[in-house]
């Protein structure tokens, strides 16, 4: 194993030019020969990164607990709260609040977003989205403007349209969800049939009742509703309501204001 000072002898032996430089700080010339010295060198690098972003207008609460990779980009007036890790090719917009206890990795976060005690990986989050606490966004998910993802919700490889809400306890996987959809507590898109992943489509303005099971492949039409506890195994037409196990269509109420 080579040590830093060995490089002088190696260069001389190979006839390479040798020059001396004077570092600004002694620790810049510190060797890294043990795991402990590696940790010290990494700590110096992390502190430099944090200082650079704070001088650029990012607020970092409790800096020693916040980790920022060198390739990360942060918008002005964003706040990183304690125990937040931002890694990979991540870009976070302006006026965001990330943390506490959050991980954002290889993701794009728009302006004015809030991510609380949650994990966002390999995903895109547009402007004014709120995630958490205790939620996970992963695997190519795309949350469009104004999406609200509350507590204990997971989104994987899915698109959620503008203004859609999933307040708590849900799994949305391999789904295409339209705008202004309400996804009730306990909803699951049952995407895996034991062999392959299947897609769920939910139209704009739909209302998915609590504890609904959407067994993919399946489509719920625009402005349709599922009753609480429904197991949806067949496509639901637009402007319809289904209930039960398995879910069945309810007859539409006659509009008494219209003459026959």
Residue ranges and their predicted role:
Residues 69-114, 118:
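Phosphate-binding active sites in nucleotide-utilizing proteins
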Residues 108, 114-260:
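Glycine-rich hexapeptide-repeat left-handed beta-helix
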Residues 34, 78-80, 96, 158, ...:
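Conserved hydrophobic/aromatic pocket- or pore-lining residues that grip, position, or stack substrates
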Residues 23-24, 35, 62-63, 70-71, ...:
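Fold-independent oxyanion-binding glycine-rich loops
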Residues 3, 37, 73, 219, ...:
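Residue-level recognition of oxygen-bearing side chains
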Residues 42-71:
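Long, charged amphipathic helices and adjacent flexible linkers at domain junctions
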Residues 1-47, 51:
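Catalytic-core segments of class I nucleotidyltransferases/pyrophosphorylases
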């Amino acid at each position: 194993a080579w040590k830093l000072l060995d490089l002088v002898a190696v260069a001389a032996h190979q006839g390479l030019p040798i020059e001396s430089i004077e570092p600004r700080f002694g620790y810049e010339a510190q060797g890294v020969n043990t795991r402990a010295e590696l940790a010290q060198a990494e700590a110096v690098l992390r502190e430099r990164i944090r200082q650079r972003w704070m001088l650029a207008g990012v607020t970092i609460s409790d800096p020693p607990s916040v980790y920022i990779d060198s390739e990360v980009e942060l918008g002005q007036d964003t706040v990183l709260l304690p125990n937040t890790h931002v890694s990979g090719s991540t870009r976070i917009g302006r006026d965001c609040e990330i943390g506490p206890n959050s991980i954002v990795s290889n993701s794009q976060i728009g302006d004015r977003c809030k991510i609380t005690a949650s994990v966002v990986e390999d995903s895109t989050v547009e402007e004014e989205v709120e995630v958490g606490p205790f939620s996970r966004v992963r695997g190519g998910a795309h949350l469009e403007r104004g999406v609200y993802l509350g507590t204990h919700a997971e989104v994987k490889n899915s698109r959620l349209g503008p203004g859609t809400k999933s307040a708590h306890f849900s799994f949305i996987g391999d789904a295409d969800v339209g705008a202004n959809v309400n996804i009730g507590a306990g909803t699951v898109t049952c995407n895996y049939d034991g062999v392959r992943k299947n897609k769920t489509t939910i139209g704009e303005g739909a209302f998915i009742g609590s504890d609904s099971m959407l067994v993919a492949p399946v489509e719920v039409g625009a402005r349709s509703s599922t009753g609480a506890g429904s197991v949806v195994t067949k496509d639901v037409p637009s402007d319809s309501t289904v209930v039960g196990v398995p879910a069945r269509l309810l007859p539409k109420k006659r509009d008494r204001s219209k003459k026959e």
